[in-house]
Amino acid sequence: MTLCFSLESWSEQNNELAIENAMKVLDSFMASFNAREMEEWSETLNYPHVRFAGSKVTVWDTKEEYSAINIFERLASTGWHHSAWLSRKVILVSENKVHISTIFQRYDENNNPLKQYQSLYIVTNKDGHWGVQARSSLAP
């Protein structure tokens, strides 16, 4: 019985650490996204990185490939200024992978809400680097 308790306790501690690391990644993801820092934003990901948006699936194999996209001009043309997490709920966790159901809000420069979206982020520990490995969103 003691051995089971010890193993369970060890597993719970690892899961708590995984959740803490995953949430830090999402904090950095949003901060670098809002700062429009493509290089920093790309460092919050693990590769290959997969994004499901609408009916489209996009895979970026490398950080360099991801850094080459220019998402900020398109978003700014919609009135977007910044985004924020409204909720983040862990739905699955292991020592090296955390699935997080999120809701985020897009805002204009006067902090007026534009749109709200649900999404799923899969954050992984790959070779000692915690990053978003995949995300699926109802955002375009």
What are these model-predicted stretches?
Residues 86-91, 103-106, 118-124:
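Hydrophobic/aromatic beta-strand elements that line small-molecule binding cavities or substrate pockets
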Residues 114-140:
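Short beta-strand edge/turn micro-motifs at domain boundaries
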Residues 38-89:
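A solvent-exposed, acidic/Ser-Thr-rich amphipathic alpha-helical stretch
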Residues 55-57, 111, 128:
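Detector for glycine-centered tight turns/loop "hinges" at secondary-structure junctions
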Residues 45, 55-56, 102-104, 121, ...:
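A mature extracytoplasmic/lumenal domain signature
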Residues 1-43:
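Short, low-complexity N-terminal intrinsically disordered segments enriched in polar/charged residues
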Residues 78, 106-114:
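Short, cysteine-centered beta-strand-loop-beta hairpins and adjacent loop/turn segments enriched
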Residues 82, 96-104:
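A short hydrophobic beta-strand element
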